[in-house]
Design a protein with these regions (language model features):
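A metal-dependent hydrolase metal-coordination microenvironment
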Residues: 1-96, 100, 107-113
């Protein structure tokens, strides 16, 4: 079974995002995706989307001392900026922590231990 998702989307609530949730869902559907994770910069997604054929995963992209961290399935605001504390905070919210840009030259993510 093939499932197609984009797990790193920014909405109009991020400096580098332009689209509303409705526009994101419409665009993703047009490209054959079954869902997306909306992870705005340092702002948890609190809006909900109810559609039986599309999954909108709430998230946040945290700016930490060692690069950007995605918190998937997070609906609460997280203020931690030290990477370990941010990962722990994501987990405490029941979320999944993923480095946003692990191969970016300015990131230390390649040298990090797995959590």
């Amino acid at each position: 079974m093939e499932v197609r998702f984009d797990l790193h989307i920014h909405s109009e609530h991020s400096p580098d995002g332009r689209m509303s949730l409705d526009e994101i869902v419409s665009c993703a559907r047009a490209r054959g995706l079954q869902g997306v994770a909306v992870c705005d910069h340092d702002r948890a997604l609190t809006e909900t989307w109810d559609a039986p054929d599309f999954l909108l995963i709430p998230g946040i992209e945290l700016s930490t001392d060692q690069g950007h961290l995605l918190g998937l399935f997070v609906t609460e605001q997280i203020e931690a900026r030290e990477l370990g504390a941010a990962i722990d905070a994501v987990h405490a919210c029941g979320g999944l922590a993923v480095m946003a840009h692990p191969f970016e030259r300015s990131s230390d993510a390649q040298r990090l231990d797995a959590y």
